[in-house]
Amino acid sequence: MIRSVVRGIGSALPKRVMKNTDFEGIVETSDEWIVQRTGIRERHIAGEGETTVSLGAAAARAAIENAGLQPSDIDLVLLATSTPNNTFPASAVAIQRELGITRGFAFDLQAVCSGFIYAITTADLYIRGGMARRVLVIGAETFSRILDWTDRTTCVLFGDGAGAIVLEAAEGHGLTSDRGILATNLRSDGNHKEKLYVDGGPSTTQTVGHLRMEGREVFKHAVGMITDVIEASFEATGLTAEDIDWFVPHQANKRIIDASAKKLHIAEEKVVITVDRHGNTSAASVPLALATAVADGRIKKGDLVLLEAMGGGFTWGAVLVRW
C-alpha cells in the first residue's frame, strides 16, 4: 500500500515585522485589545520585492534542501494561495520556474485558509494514484495586499508568509503506525460565502478588492465545523484524541484554537501555537506552524500529528499524518 510520507519541510517570512503597537497610529486599537481578542502580538508584512511567488519559492527551496533532494526530483508543484502574483498564469508555474524545474506539472489551488489542507489531500491522491512520486506542497500568501487598512476588525489579524513540505511515495502496510498521510477529510458549504470574502475580482469589479469578514459569524461556526471533521478522521482510522502527539491547527485566533482543543479533549501542551508571532497567514498558516514545531524539536519522526483549517466559503478540513 502506497503512503504519502513527509520527506522535507521549509518556511519563509518577510523581513518586516509589524507589532500591535504599530497599528495604533493607523486605526483605533491597542495591543491589549488585539491580544485579548486574538492572541496575536505581531505579524510579518511583505515589503517591496516580496511576493507570494518569492516567499513560496524560498519556502520550497528550504523544503527540498531539508528533504535532501534536488528541484529536478519534484514531479508536481502544488501551491495553495488566494493571493497569487497574477490572475494567470498560476503562481505555482512561476515558482516552478524560480526553482529551475522543467519537468512534471504545476498548478494553484484556492480554498483560502483551508488551502494547505486541501492541497495535502490533493497531493496524496496524486501520489496514491501513481501520477506523481514526489509532490512539493506549498502554502503562500500576501494577505497584506488585500486588506482594508482602515478596518480595525480585519487589518490587525493577518500576516504574510509561506511554508512548504515535500511528500514522497513510500510503501506502507495499511496500519496507523505507518509513516505518512493516514486520513484526510474535506468539507465546504457555499451558504456561508458572504461571511468571509473579498469584495472584488476580475469577473465582477475588475479590481483586486479587499477582505471583508463577519468575525462573530465565523467564530460561531468555526469550532463545531472543525471538531466535526476531525472526529470523522478519528472514526475513519480508529484513532482518538488521546493518540495525538501534536495538534497543529490553523492559526487564525487563539480563542478558536483553545475552544477546539478543549472540545476535542486535546491537552494544551500538545497544541502548536504560532498565531502570536505570525497572525493569520491563511494557507501558509499550517505549514508555518508545522515548520516551527519541527525546527524546535517538538515534532519528531513517528509522531502522530493532527492538522486542521477552516476558511472562507466556508471551507474546512483535517489531515492525520504520522511524521
Curated annotation (Swiss-Prot):
Pathway in which this enzyme or protein is active: Lipid metabolism; fatty acid biosynthesis
Record key words, sorted: Acyltransferase, Cytoplasm, Fatty acid biosynthesis, Fatty acid metabolism, Lipid biosynthesis, Lipid metabolism, Multifunctional enzyme, Transferase
Disulfide bonds: none
Active site, renumbered: C113, H250, N280
UniProt keyword Acyltransferase present: yes
GO biological process: fatty acid biosynthetic process
Assembly behavior: Homodimer.
NCBIfam families in alphabetical order: fabH, PRK09352.1
Function: Catalyzes the condensation reaction of fatty acid synthesis by the addition to an acyl acceptor of two carbons from malonyl-ACP. Catalyzes the first condensation reaction which initiates fatty acid synthesis and may therefore play a role in governing the total rate of fatty acid production. Possesses both acetoacetyl-ACP synthase and acetyl transacylase activities. Its substrate specificity determines the biosynthesis of branched-chain and/or straight-chain of fatty acids.
Family from the record: Belongs to the thiolase-like superfamily. FabH family.
Name of the protein in question: Beta-ketoacyl-[acyl-carrier-protein] synthase III
Source organism per UniProt: Brucella suis (strain ATCC 23445 / NCTC 10510)
Lineage, broadest ranks: Bacteria, Pseudomonadati, Pseudomonadota, Alphaproteobacteria, Hyphomicrobiales
